[in-house]
């Protein structure tokens, strides 16, 4: 989960100010956590406490305003009855990483990813995006190879992952939909040799930088099974006491597991 938060923070200055070279400053004074982190931690909190996803997502968004939430999501937060609004935006995928770390079977992961998405993003593509990211994290942390993950996600969700970042960048434009941003973020993980490398790959897409880096960072952390002290030392001080508490409690409970072989 820290990989997702690191990606969000690193990508935050570049969402509307794209980079052109991969050696851009990873963290700087303009970096901050955005809605990606807030809602990721809302999902983590819901899992830790056994609470409703929608309730926690709405509550956290109210208590942490002005973090870059979408307009339709903002209206959902303020509504008295909070009905899902048929979204296929990547908001469902950006917040789902805790699901991939917390649950122990493919069936549970896909079920919980759907539940975490459909309180807002009940469009099939919105649900698919959340499930694809959660499944990638589950597969990565249970020992699947990158090729196995590619084949599983392509087969299950119909995403075209047989592309290179170099080819994608030639024509890629800013896209906040699941179908137009999640596959590319997953490919950023495929071409990475570390969490930092995955985050840089995602930001260099020159798209929805914080969200795609959030997605790529979460998957890559699960794959390598480690998180550098340098990143931790930078990220945690940017979070308040409540958020630090959620991160530590969640990681203590769910992020210490050893990898096992993913069954076909």
Label each region the model flagged.
Residues 1-264:
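Structured, active/binding-site neighborhoods that engage oxygen-rich ligands
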């Amino acid at each position: 989960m820290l990989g997702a938060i690191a990606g969000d923070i690193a990508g935050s200055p570049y969402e509307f100010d794209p980079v052109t070279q991969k050696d851009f400053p990873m963290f700087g004074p303009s970096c901050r956590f955005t809605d990606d982190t807030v809602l990721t931690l809302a999902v983590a909190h819901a899992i830790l406490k056994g609470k409703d996803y929608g309730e926690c997502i709405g509550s956290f968004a109210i208590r942490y305003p002005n973090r870059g939430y979408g307009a339709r999501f903002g209206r959902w937060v303020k509504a008295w009855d909070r009905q899902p609004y048929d979204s296929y935006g990547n908001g469902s995928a950006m917040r789902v990483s805790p699901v991939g770390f917390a649950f122990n079977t493919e069936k549970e992961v896909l079920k919980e990813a759907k539940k975490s998405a459909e309180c807002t993003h009940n469009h099939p593509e919105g649900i698919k995006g959340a499930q694809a990211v959660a499944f990638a994290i589950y597969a990565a942390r249970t020992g699947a190879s990158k090729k196995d993950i590619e084949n599983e996600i392509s087969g299950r969700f119909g995403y075209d992952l047989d592309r290179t970042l170099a080819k994608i960048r030639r024509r890629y434009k800013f896209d906040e939909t699941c179908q137009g941003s999640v596959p590319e973020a997953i490919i950023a993980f495929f071409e990475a040799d570390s969490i930092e490398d995955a985050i840089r790959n995602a930001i260099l897409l020159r798209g929805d930088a914080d969200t795609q880096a959030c997605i790529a960072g979460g998957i890559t952390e699960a794959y390598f099974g480690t998180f550098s002290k340098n990143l931790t030392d930078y990220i945690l001080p940017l979070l308040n006491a409540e958020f630090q508490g959620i991160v530590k409690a969640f990681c203590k409970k769910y992020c210490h597991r050893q990898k096992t072989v993913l069954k076909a």
